[in-house]
């Protein structure tokens, strides 16, 4: 008597017809995992983060998906670049007191958001020369490069999407609903 194929032995989960995937973001072995599981992982689970990138990111204090998704300078760079899209040349009212002086080095305080976007990452206040050099190794040279850094964006998206993931199979959800009706 032969064994049934593994696919026939598997119980239905309720996700068999789903087609969403993040196959270009994570390693092959991790493609079928829950987003919530990925969210708790270290960054080498991301496709393209090899040993060198991992060492560089760890030197920046970034070890996990959460660290990468919430990296202070990534979020700041993304805010600057996003707001630069709304900026009108010469559109600042004379009475405006709007500023990001606590986010950028002194020589960039009077610059437009578009100019800051194109500035080197060293324009961001508090980013050390060592950190800037490490970012350079990852080919992140400008504030815009940092805002667009795909690994930060992937980690951020996985963290955010994981908040909406159903982690119970169909049968588990049905059993839970039945238990609620009995209570």
Model-identified regions with their sequence ranges:
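C-terminal extensions
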Residues: 2-183
């Amino acid at each position: 008597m032969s064994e049934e194929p593994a696919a026939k032995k598997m119980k239905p989960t309720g996700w068999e017809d789903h087609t969403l995937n993040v196959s270009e973001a994570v390693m092959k072995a991790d493609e079928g995992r829950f987003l919530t599981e990925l969210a708790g992982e270290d960054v080498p689970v991301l496709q393209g983060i090899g040993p060198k990138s991992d060492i560089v990111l760890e030197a920046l204090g970034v070890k996990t998906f959460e660290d990468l998704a919430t990296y202070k300078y990534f979020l700041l760079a993304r805010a600057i670049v996003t707001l630069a899209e709304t900026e009108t040349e010469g559109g600042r009212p004379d009475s405006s007191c709007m500023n990001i002086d606590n986010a950028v080095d002194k020589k960039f305080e009077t610059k437009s958001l578009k100019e800051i976007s194109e500035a080197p990452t060293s324009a961001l206040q508090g980013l050390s020369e060592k950190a800037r050099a490490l970012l350079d190794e990852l080919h992140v040279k400008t504030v815009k490069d940092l805002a667009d850094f795909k690994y930060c964006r992937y980690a951020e998206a996985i963290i955010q999407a994981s908040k909406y993931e159903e982690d119970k199979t169909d049968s588990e959800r049905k059993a839970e609903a039945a238990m609620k009706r009995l209570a």
